[in-house]
Design a protein with these regions (language model features):
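Basic, glycine-/proline-tolerant helical and adjacent loop/strand elements
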Residues: 41-86, 90-144
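Ferredoxin-type iron-sulfur electron-transfer modules and their immediate structural context
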Residues: 1-84, 189, 194-195, 199
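Histidine (H) residue identity feature
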Residues: 50, 109, 158, 202-204
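Polar low-complexity intrinsically disordered regions
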Residues: 30-33, 95-97, 204-205
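Phenylalanine-focused residue identity feature
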Residues: 2, 94, 115, 139, ...
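Long C-terminal interaction/binding lobes of large macromolecular proteins
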Residues: 121-136, 183-205
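N-terminal accessory interaction module
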Residues: 128-187
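Generic structural hydrophobic/aromatic packing signal, biased to beta-strands
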Residues: 1-2, 21-24, 35, 95, ...
């Protein structure tokens, strides 16, 4: 018989170990400090609604179904400035979770050239317009007085400015059903970036 190679912790040891918890679910900005190019940026975030909805063609109209009503509660959100990131992977090495921030976090392009050369990412084209690409497919979000208008190859969605719930959706072509998660993500990101430097500079090229 042999003693266990790894023994269980005593109650006191377990309590001591729990004190080492970084509380990553509340705030974790490790990747912003270990990036040699300062490409990862932490943005202060107020609690925001995050509805999960899907648009379904219903006869001559479109029906919006709400699957859940979530909320974005973390005080800080991380974005990656693609222009400055050389994808060295340092942030992935130090990330206390299994993530790779330079790949997982929204990639923000400050220049038109950087945005045009990337298959994915976002660019604040003007103080009221966010452009994006996912898998090479373009979409845009325009901020209006009472909300947002999101346009992609699949749909045009009008979102309420307070709840981010869809108030009107038009499905394009032969599209019979489309998730609205991309629209909500774009609106959430716009709220984080708008009026914040270096994303909302006085000139947008």
């Amino acid at each position: 018989d042999f003693d266990p190679a790894i023994r269980t912790l005593t109650e006191e040891e377990a309590m001591d170990e729990s004190r080492r918890c970084l509380q990553c679910d509340l705030v974790c900005n490790v990747c912003t400090t270990v990036c040699p190019n300062r490409a990862n940026v932490a943005l202060l975030s107020l609690p925001m609604p995050h509805p999960v909805q899907v648009a379904v063609r219903d006869g001559d109209g479109v029906r919006v179904e709400t699957l859940s009503n979530g909320r974005l509660e973390q005080s800080y959100q991380i974005v990656n400035i693609a222009d400055a990131c050389n994808e060295c992977g340092n942030c992935a090495t130090f990330c206390p979770s299994a993530g790779a921030p330079y790949r997982d976090k929204p990639r923000i392009h400050l220049s038109r050239e950087s945005f045009d050369n990337a298959p994915d990412g976002y660019r604040l084209a003007s103080p009221s317009r966010l452009e994006g690409k996912r898998g090479g497919k373009a979409f845009s979000l325009a901020a209006e007085k009472d909300g947002f208008v999101f346009e992609s190859d699949a749909l045009i969605a009008h979102l309420d400015g307070g709840t981010l719930c869809a108030t009107k959706v038009t499905l394009n072509g032969d599209v019979n059903e489309a998730a609205l998660s991309g629209a909500v993500e774009a609106a959430t990101l716009f709220r984080l970036l708008a009026r914040k430097q270096p994303f909302a500079g006085p000139k947008h090229k």
